[in-house]
């Protein structure tokens, strides 16, 4: 019997558009001989709809105007337990932070990807650092900035950052993905502007020393015995891998495998699996590293529990390089969700 799978897309995060593109790719490549699919779109204002129209309209955003194929029963499909598993192809806020995972847990429906705790910790860049510091994982030096403290003690915070980190630094909203709200500061003026911008997206901001490093990504797949694909490398078109470089600028390059020695490739794979286990991840995650160009020291950058599934995304590309077809990968992560729920 075919399993019934709800594919959730859209949502209220700043990554709404990226989610639609990822979901379109999943819907076009899922094995329909194994699964009956229920596409459920969530608008930016939080309304849920089952959408049975053209997949291309999901990617473009036109699905919201396609009233004939848009049914206001999206929530009921989950609440009435009409599906066997949920695949939240939703990046960022509410999709990747433990919120939808908690809803599925309450409804006793298997959910693709890590669970509530793991998703919440991995989504929050600051808490990821706090947790992994206790495991001795090497990370870039940082300062955490709170919106309330910044408002009342701006110059003290600026001085702390300058004294501890110097320049250059990266400024990142703690709970944001796809490089939304991230900037690089080379001086005080850019630091202040970057903090103001990042605080528009989150009340908590991470400021990190900017390493002269290469960006290495590792796809991890599995539950109790996860495995890692051969690492890939991002060569950004811009100064760093910002939103434009990820989704708009064709000059960014994805190298598979990463241009590292065989020994270093293996070390990065092993470290990715260790971090996956440390954070109690499950199903899938993409673990991103920075490798210092001079010393070749490996630093954790971040973990993505719902990695991009667009046609140019690194996660599926890394597994395709291992011989795992896109549709096969989708099937495997769905089955991993069911497997974990049955234990």
From Swiss-Prot:
Pathway given for this chain reads:
Cell wall biogenesis; peptidoglycan biosynthesis
Q: What class of enzyme is it?
A: ligase
Q: What does this protein do?
A: Cell wall formation.
Recite the UniProt cofactor note for this protein.
Binds 2 magnesium or manganese ions per subunit.
What GO terms fall under cellular component here? cytosol
| Keyword annotations of the record | ATP-binding, Cell shape, Cell wall biogenesis/degradation, Cytoplasm, Ligase, Magnesium, Manganese, Metal-binding, Nucleotide-binding, Peptidoglycan synthesis
The reply to whether Hydrolase figures as a keyword in the UniProt entry is: no
According to UniProt, the reaction catalysed is: 2 D-alanine + ATP = D-alanyl-D-alanine + ADP + phosphate + H(+)
Q: Which residues form the ATP-grasp domain?
A: 129-335
Residues where Mg(2+) 2 binds: 302, 304
Matches recorded under Gene3D superfamilies: 3.40.50.20, ATP-grasp fold, A domain (3.30.1490.20), ATP-grasp fold, B domain (3.30.470.20)
Could you tell me the gene encoding this protein?
Answer: ddl
Its Enzyme Commission number(s) read 6.3.2.4
Q: What is its main location?
A: cytoplasm
Which InterPro entries does the annotation name?
A: ATP-grasp, ATP_grasp_subdomain_1, D-Ala_lig_Van_CS, D_ala_D_ala, Dala_Dala_lig_C, Dala_Dala_lig_N, PreATP-grasp_dom_sf
Q: Name one GO biological process term.
A: cell wall organization
Q: Which cofactor does it need?
A: Mg(2+); Mn(2+)
Query: Would you tell me the protein name for this molecule?
Result: D-alanine--D-alanine ligase
Sequence positions that bind ATP: 162-217
A single GO molecular function term of this UniProt record: metal ion binding
Question: Where, by residue number, does Mg(2+) 1 bind?
Answer: 288, 302
Cell location: Cytoplasm
- What is the similarity comment for this entry? Belongs to the D-alanine--D-alanine ligase family.
